[in-house]
């Protein structure tokens, strides 16, 4: 069993191109023995965003704090605290913080595809 406070996990800067003012904490990952899923906590500063990207795995997102939009190829959806998103594999997406406070969200991704 792993038990840790999220602030004890390193806040890292992702290396992907197209990121602005976004960081991530890998709360649960393979290094913890998790073989099926990773749990990540993202933090996006006001005006910041993830890259517009797609990948061959689905993921599930729970918005903890903040507000903004999730942009897709054909539409965009606003988000606020408490919202949940399912993003299927190969769907273009980008999280943009349009609010005045830090956006924080949990994102779960599979290891097995």
Tell where the protein language model's regions lie, with residue ranges:
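Conserved short histidine dyad/triad with adjacent acidic residue
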Residues: 25, 40-55, 89
């Amino acid at each position: 069993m792993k038990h840790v406070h999220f602030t004890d996990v390193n806040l890292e800067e992702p290396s992907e191109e197209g990121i602005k003012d976004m960081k991530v904490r890998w709360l649960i990952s393979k290094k913890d023995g998790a073989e099926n899923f990773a749990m990540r906590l993202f933090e996006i500063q006001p005006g910041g965003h993830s890259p517009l990207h797609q990948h061959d795995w689905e993921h599930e997102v729970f918005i903890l704090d903040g507000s903004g939009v999730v942009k897709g190829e054909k539409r965009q959806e606003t988000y606020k605290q408490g919202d949940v998103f399912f993003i299927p594999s190969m769907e273009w997406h980008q999280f943009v913080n349009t609010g005045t406070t830090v956006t924080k969200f949990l994102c779960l991704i599979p290891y097995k595809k």
